[in-house]
């Protein structure tokens, strides 16, 4: 039985893709439905994890809602000192953005919790593919791997109204 070369190439490609898919590892703290690093992606992307910690003080409960253009992670609550995290694959051209609204009694703010150009490049990028944030009343502060402190603090996003 003589197999044409074009079918042999196709067969090898199918075996390669099947092998890659079966070896893929995809674990999220919560599922992100449109995650480009999921097991059905042949082109791997670097995975990131964002951790959010309630550091409001005064026993304040933090209500928050995080999402991207494609993924809505839902409304959530963090008690004082609690943390929550989610993982995702970065977009191929480095345009990944996740933003969150945060509220507690008498206050409401929003912040871009993950911005590719801020968190994946430059001097203050997140190390080890993990961005850890403490949410404080005056703004979010990210862990700095150089100083080993939460001293990379940013202002809240400007309100649109």
UniProtKB/Swiss-Prot annotation:
Q: List the disulfide bonds.
A: none
Q: Where in the cell is it found?
A: Secreted
Q: Record's Pfam families?
A: Self-incomp_S1
Single GO biological process annotation from the record? rejection of self pollen
Looking at the UniProt entry, the stretches that span the membrane are none
> Can you tell me which residues are glycosylated?
75, 106, 157
Gene Ontology CC terms: extracellular region
Q: Which residues form the signal peptide?
A: 1-24
What does the UniProt keyword field contain? Glycoprotein, Secreted, Self-incompatibility, Signal
Q: Where does the UniProt entry say this protein principally localizes?
A: secreted
Family the entry assigns: Belongs to the plant self-incompatibility (S1) protein family.
Q: What is this protein called?
A: S-protein homolog 2
What's the source species for this entry?
Answer: Arabidopsis thaliana (Mouse-ear cress)
Supply the gene name: SPH2
